[in-house]
Amino acid sequence: MATRGHNPRANNEGYIGRPGKQWLQVNAKTVNIDGVDIKEAVTGGQYAPIPNMIHSAAMHNGLYRGKNLTEYFESGQMSTDIADGTFANIYIGDYINKPITVNGTTYNVKWEVADLDYFLHSGDAETTAHHAVMFPSVTVQTNVPMNDTNTTAGGFKGSKMWGDTIPLYVTGIKAAFGADHVLTHRELLTKTVDVNADSAAGAGWKGSTTDWEWTDVDVNIPSEPMIYGTAVFGSSGFDVGNKEKQLAIFRFKKFSEGRKWFWLQAVASSSRFAIADNYGTASFTDASLSYASGGVRPYFLLR
């Protein structure tokens, strides 16, 4: 059946034939919702003006942009758009350039938006405030061990990392962003290890976490699922806790800009913790490892 010049409707909608001319006619149409020209907003990369009906953490977690939000944060508007849950001009991969000082050393950090509302409604004391998970684009500090010796006794909560190193980052991040912008939330952290129990990491390894505890957290290092979307070398389900899903940024950006490994919370055995390797692999290493090729890459919740 010939279709050239077929015109099914009086207003030319659905016109078939002469594609060059007809595409220009269709493309010239304005799609307007709530006073916003959607075609202009999308083709111009201006996501923020799109109507509020599609502004949410769920929608914005599915878009990677990579825009510098430093001035936006300093203006105070970013915190307003987080607090109301619209995240109106905040997308995954957007970032804030903000140096932090840790134990007397200042690090210039590009803090990327890694996820929106990751911990919302989680915790024994429910997290009800909207938030953005901020995660450095690179490993911040190298030559930092998880423990002084090759032991995982006490789980992650009993580690030197949690007891000594993380508090230094809490101080540095609160000083840089303002304490009111750092959301305290609740996480399950492992606290006991049975050195004789089989590790879920396999390979005949011994040492498995056996308990956890709800803990106030301002700053932390990631779990395995936050990076990979699943447990890999974790010794048991206790290593996952309430950090059981992948951060949105790792669905788009599966690398560290500086190619340095970083520690993860999971106990792998009686002497090892999990790491995200600088070669792009899920891995593990001795708890006392202190080396220039890796270290600490902490996250916090911005409000």
Where are these regions (language model features)?
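Collagenous Gly-X-Y triple-helix signature in extracellular proteins
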Residues: 46-303
